[in-house]
């Protein structure tokens, strides 16, 4: 919706986090990754609000808030799933923090990151993780 947010504050609210990197003009892996996240969100049912889902744009020059909003709508993404963009430097910094940076966006690989809570280690799923695999990692993170 165009509001400025700080990623650390967004993902450190105590909820488990599910995160990936996408860009809206991608025609290869981004649509399937986004579809899979939508399936995960749907299958979470009543637990959906207990998980912070974040998709970070790796193409901030093109991915405006409006473009990301339209992209999210196309996949049925709903709160608390957020799509983030920012400066090129901020996008690169976040990608590097997750060891996911590729100088050429066309060369980016499908990665999924999950974390139970602030201070906990991140789980990294390399490749196009399917909804059952993501849910198998995520559901235990929801247990008390």
Regions found by a protein language model. Name each.
Residues 1-6, 135-144:
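Non-globular targeting/processing and membrane-anchoring segments
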Residues 3, 42, 99-101:
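Short beta-turn/strand-loop junction motif enriched in small, turn-promoting residues
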Residues 7-31, 35-37:
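Short active-site neighborhood of thiol/selenol oxidoreductases, capturing the structured segment around
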Residues 12-16, 48-53, 63, 107-110:
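Extracytoplasmic
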Residues 19, 23-27, 55-58, 80-81, ...:
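Second-shell loop/turn segments in exported
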Residues 20, 27-31, 62, 85, ...:
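Soluble non-cytosolic domains of exported or imported proteins
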Residues 32-81, 88-94:
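Structural microenvironment flanking redox-active thiols in thiol-disulfide oxidoreductases
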Residues 77-133:
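Thiol/selenol-based redox catalytic cores and closely related redox-interacting motifs
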């Amino acid at each position: 919706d165009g509001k400025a947010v700080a990623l650390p504050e967004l993902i450190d609210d105590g909820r488990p986090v599910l995160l990936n990197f996408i860009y809206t003009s991608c025609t290869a892996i981004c649509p399937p990754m986004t579809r899979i996240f939508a399936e995960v969100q749907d299958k979470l049912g009543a637990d959906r609000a207990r998980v912070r889902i974040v998709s970070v744009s790796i193409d901030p020059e093109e991915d405006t808030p409006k473009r990301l909003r339209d992209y999210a709508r196309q996949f049925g993404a709903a709160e608390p799933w957020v799509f983030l963009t920012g400066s090129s430097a901020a996008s690169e910094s976040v990608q590097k923090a997750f060891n996911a940076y590729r100088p050429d966006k066309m060369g980016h690989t499908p990665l999924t990151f999950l974390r139970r809570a602030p201070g906990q280690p991140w789980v990294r799923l390399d490749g196009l993780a399917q909804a059952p695999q993501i849910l198998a990692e995520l559901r235990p993170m929801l247990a008390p």
